[in-house]
């Protein structure tokens, strides 16, 4: 039996990598589309040897994009996390790193026309219902990938791509502080539950018997720590309006400690069971936001300045992630960040016709 060829762009977005598809090049939403995405990535084989996934949650990601019918957006973007070692596709969250590639994809595929040295692309994030605006560098009417901006976790330099968000608070949980408190206690551990684009549970590393400066490999090998984190996560899912999270990748769990390298706060994130080599975009936004909230577990560890526009550097195992937060009379109004993206290939990805024969003609 032959193979089905699906048009695809493989792109690095921020510190992640994923397959970018036009909505109409895939089956309609449902079990068939999920089977196609699993086949594309090679899941549930833990090595993903028969697909284009990289045997890592950071490289087993998909963006599904189409022209938007909304007045306030140019394109609609649906993020799919293809679980590496399970036959499961999770649509329950955004990915701000993969988001960084959506604007360039829209221009590469002709969904948006270039306009000047920088082209704004308004992106409706279907997973959570929020709008982001990506300023894509478009020298000479084309996406400009080369530049001198460096982000931690990515070798080399590339063109800066600025992404801003007006209102992502409570995107998944319905409120910035979904439990209604800046601090809660679960199983004897003080936590802050926050959702400023990503549901995150923040904990002081020392309360879990670690420093928070350990390498990811050390934390990965600590089965007692991971068991305790998961017990806390499962209890907090319903309290964060997320329901049963046993089969979901949210909320993320994030261990905090005082900054070591001149940043605002130091982090070790779990997504949800593996220690992240850096930190997700929206995870960093939620952590940075918590640093400004009175009574949060982050506030006592964080080093912050005053003012209505604050830059907070979230330290992580690969370096730091800087988030700019805007405030008005002490109330958080918006946030922005700098990412980079790069087109890796433009072609087709092949799957067996026994999985899907392709779109009807």
Curated annotation (Swiss-Prot):
**Which InterPro entries does the UniProt entry name for this protein?**
OMA_tautomer-like, PrpF-like
EC number assigned by the record: 5.3.2.8
Instruction: Check the record and name the SUPFAM superfamilies matching this protein.
Output: Diaminopimelate epimerase-like (SSF54506)
UniProt cross-references to Gene3D superfamilies, sorted A to Z = Diaminopimelate Epimerase, Chain A, domain 1
Catalyzed chemical reaction(s): (1E)-4-oxobut-1-ene-1,2,4-tricarboxylate = 4-carboxy-2-hydroxy-cis,cis-muconate
What processes in GO biological process is this protein linked to? gallate catabolic process
Q: What happens when the gene is disrupted?
A: Does not prevent growth in 5 mM gallate medium, but the mutant strain grows poorly at gallate concentrations lower than 2 mM.
Please provide, alphabetically and separated by semicolons, the GO molecular function terms listed in this UniProt record. Answer: intramolecular oxidoreductase activity, transposing C=C bonds
Keywords of this entry? Aromatic hydrocarbons catabolism, Isomerase
Q: Which family does it belong to?
A: Belongs to the PrpF family.
Q: What does this protein do?
A: Catalyzes the tautomerization of the 4-oxalomesaconic acid keto (OMAketo) generated by GalA dioxygenase to 4-oxalomesaconic acid enol (OMAenol). Mediates the second step in gallate degradation pathway.
Q: What name appears for this protein in its UniProt entry? A: 4-oxalomesaconate tautomerase
Q: Which organism is it from?
A: Pseudomonas putida (strain ATCC 47054 / DSM 6125 / CFBP 8728 / NCIMB 11950 / KT2440)
Tell me the lineage of the source organism. Answer: Bacteria, Pseudomonadati, Pseudomonadota, Gammaproteobacteria, Pseudomonadales
